A protein has these predicted regions:
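N-terminal, active-site-proximal structural segment of metallo-dependent hydrolase catalytic domains
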Residues: 2-197, 207-214, 285, 340-341, ...
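Short secondary-structure boundary/capping segments
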Residues: 147-149, 325-328
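Surface-exposed beta-strand-to-loop junctions
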Residues: 143-149, 169-174, 196-199, 261-269, ...
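Active site of divalent-metal-dependent phosphoester/diester hydrolases
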Residues: 40-42, 46-55, 59, 64-67, ...
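Alpha-helix termini
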Residues: 118-120, 254-259, 292-304, 331-341
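Structured beta-strand-rich core segments of catalytic domains in phosphoester-bond hydrolases
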Residues: 91, 95-128, 177-278, 348-357, ...
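Active-site-proximal segments of metal-dependent phosphoesterases and phosphodiesterases across multiple
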Residues: 270-289, 320, 327, 331
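Active-site beta-strand/loop signature of hydrolases that rely on acidic residues for catalysis
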Residues: 130-137, 161-189, 218, 250-251, ...
Length: 512
């Protein structure tokens, strides 16, 4: 077949099923075909995203994404995107890289099902929910710390390339709820375009102060209703332990066809500093207090009852470290430990983690909220600062808790709110009322460690925790050994320096 005939056949068939503005991005590659093997590779490379779209197990994913943006199909435009000093390779060579990397990556990521029932079997009593969590790597952080990406293929670091790869993986998961970390604010609107077309609504919370990225929480508005939410700032002025710009988003959702089926989903991105586990513990205490406030249903004879909860994100901590144990075990004694939350003979933590003036108990509950619930007294005012609202006044003259919570001391104190119900401050031990499990077990059946990112070596720092839900399937994580066979991420298959996490749950109606 002549080159002209090949182009005509390619265009006639290629344009039938393409819905995006970048449908001709592979067109210029056709002219380079010199033999049948090359022609076959082109057909495979150009049509694979579309074949995946139409032969997927669900028809909900309707926007096919092509790999190479249109303006990257010639060397001059590629130099514009990547910089004049970038080493530019031919589109065919890039396509070879893409196919090789993607095939390796796809072989590592499989959906593992635990239940035999159909994943579309929604009923009046239950709903099948899929959640995806992904740290997508803010471009400005990549460019601010280029020394971290010296070993990477520079052409895979372009935002235009990474955005396509990220969206391809995110949309391909067909999740009802998507939790993204490191969503750069200036890239938000363009990133939302295909997601809005598929019916996703969103919440966005930028990190505080001068940070340029934040959290993006998306949910399918044709399936879920947003009932309540909180955008949580983990920065609290005047508190050394809480002077970092991390944030959280908490959403209370109901199933649109049956609003009595509800749950709470939260996402966060905790402090990175590997030495400051104590900071992450304090951030977690604050975040869990807000989750407790939103997820609460009622008090019963056996204690408080809560909605099902999912907590997902980049926690910047490894499995079985102090904060991890606190989340899954519900209790952690920090007094006498070092800032890494390990036992130490020097510079150990005292009995006080965060100051009582925030009115958050050692059981990760807001004191004001508890008083309102148990006594019907006062207001349920939360004593946390938030730059999106008027800052709270924590002075003694204006605090409704001054008579009960001693806010000017770090001494241990216990307060009886109701008969046989006491709360503690500065006890040296944290607890929380939830029963979290991790979706991932962090090692495979052979004892090999799973991984979500590479920080000098492949480790796990990203998690999906859940309570009172039935886990149906999980998007399997590769082991560190298998990850080492991939080109350093981001690459031409993975658009971030983290791997995405996803799981499918059965959500049942809460029984009151």
């Amino acid at each position: 077949m002549s080159g002209l005939a090949a182009k005509q056949v390619f265009l006639r068939n290629f344009c039938k099923n393409i819905l995006t503005s970048e449908r001709l991005s592979c067109y210029n590659l056709v002219g380079t075909m010199a033999n049948s093997a090359a022609q076959q590779k082109l057909n495979q490379a150009s049509m694979e995203p579309f074949l995946e779209t139409y032969y997927t197990s669900s028809n909900n994913y309707e926007i096919p994404l092509n790999f190479l943006p249109e303006n990257l199909t010639c060397e001059s435009n590629m130099q514009t995107v990547l910089g004049t000093n970038a080493c530019v390779e031919t589109p065919m060579f890039l396509m070879d890289k893409y196919m090789s990397d993607k095939q390796k990556y796809k072989a590592m990521r499989q959906w593992i099902r635990f239940k035999k029932e159909k994943l579309t079997s929604n009923s009046e009593e239950s709903f099948i929910l899929r959640v995806l969590s992904f740290n997508i790597l803010a471009q400005y952080l990549l460019e601010t710390y280029p020394f971290l990406y010296k070993a990477h293929d520079k052409q895979a670091l372009s935002w235009k390339i990474r955005r396509q790869l990220l969206l391809q993986e995110i949309l391909g998961a067909q999740a009802n709820v998507i939790c993204l970390q490191e969503m750069q604010e200036e890239h938000l609107e363009e990133f939302l375009v295909p997601l809005r077309e598929l019916g996703y609504n969103y919440l966005y919370k930028k990190r505080t102060n001068d940070k340029k990225d934040g959290l993006l929480f998306l949910y399918r508005s044709d399936q879920l209703i947003l009932i309540d939410y909180a955008k949580v700032e983990l920065y609290q002025s005047g508190i050394e332990l809480l002077n970092r710009d991390n944030v959280g988003i908490i959403a209370k959702l109901a199933v649109k066809k049956n609003p009595e089926i509800q749950l709470v989903i939260a996402t966060t991105h905790l402090l990175y500093n590997p030495r400051r586990h104590d900071v992450r513990l304090g951030q977690t205490q604050l975040l869990l207090a807000e989750i407790e406030r939103i997820a609460f249903l009622e008090n019963t004879m056996t204690g408080a009852k809560y909605l099902p909860i999912i907590l997902a994100g980049d926690f910047n901590l490894q499995p079985h470290s102090g904060v991890y144990k606190f989340i899954v075990e519900g209790v952690f004694e920090y007094q006498g430990r070092g800032k890494n939350l390990e036992r130490t003979d020097y510079r150990f933590l005292s009995n006080s983690l965060i100051p009582p003036r925030l009115c958050i108990t050692d059981n990760c509950q807001h004191f004001n909220v508890l008083k309102q619930r148990l006594r019907g007294e006062g207001t349920d005012k939360v004593m946390l600062e938030n730059s999106e609202h008027h800052n709270v006044d924590t002075s003694e003259n204006n605090s409704s808790n001054v008579c009960e919570v001693k806010t000017d001391t770090t001494d241990f104190q216990t307060i009886e709110i109701a008969h046989d119900y006491r709360v503690n401050f500065c006890s040296g031990t944290l607890t929380h009322p939830f029963h979290f499990n991790s979706v991932y077990k962090h090692q495979n059946c052979h004892g090999e460690q799973e991984a979500t990112t590479n920080q000098g070596k492949w480790i796990t720092v990203d998690y999906i925790f859940y309570s009172d839900l039935e886990l149906l399937e999980v998007y399997d994580l590769p082991t560190a050994t298998r990850c080492n066979t991939l080109p350093t991420i981001p690459n031409f298959a993975v658009g971030s320096d983290h791997l995405c996490l996803a799981a499918t749950f059965k959500l049942r109606k809460s029984k009151l």
